[in-house]
């Protein structure tokens, strides 16, 4: 967790969780609807919800960074000379979501010039764009993740552990990495094909509909 930023008018810190990955991680907000990629968000909301903890604060997003050392390939010495620095920098670009706030202060605290070199947010004459999320939208994610974790816990307690590996555009070979594949004896004909590959705005719209009658945002507002 990183204490990113504290406004002059408040002692409330904005908190992010950054996951350093040995492999390439492609984050999709729509995965949350299917109960995937919850881990870093669970950490984030747990930190921010604990009012007695030194690390509490307002959630400011989740980012994934490829931390492995890559070999840079070039077709010629001239190409290497012209593109070496850009390729070096591109290795450290993170993906995920960043909290959108007034004047984009949080994004600027991470990358001052907002060129989109290191975070999935960039600025131009037309404004700031990228993988941004509002505090209210993070509140909807909080509600959804709480609901999913509660459902998972109840199912485990009741012995519901079905053989239903997932399969979508980012999870093609789930069984290849499963420690229980030998005893499961799955023929790979049994797959829980999930994910409509929704755009971020469609995910938020879906969450609004799901929780439109709920009051409050699970303490994710300042």
Task: Report residues per predicted region.
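Single conserved hydrophobic/aromatic residue that forms the stacking wall/gate
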Residues: 1-9, 13
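Short, conserved glycine- and acidic-residue-centered signature motifs
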Residues: 5, 36-39
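Active-site ExK catalytic segment of metal-dependent nucleases
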Residues: 7, 15-24
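Cation-handling catalytic/transport regions enriched in His/Asp/Glu
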Residues: 22, 44, 54
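Short amphipathic alpha-helical face segments that pack within enzyme cores
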Residues: 38-46
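Metal-dependent nuclease catalytic regions and adjoining charged, substrate-binding loops involved
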Residues: 48-180, 185-188, 192-194, 198-222
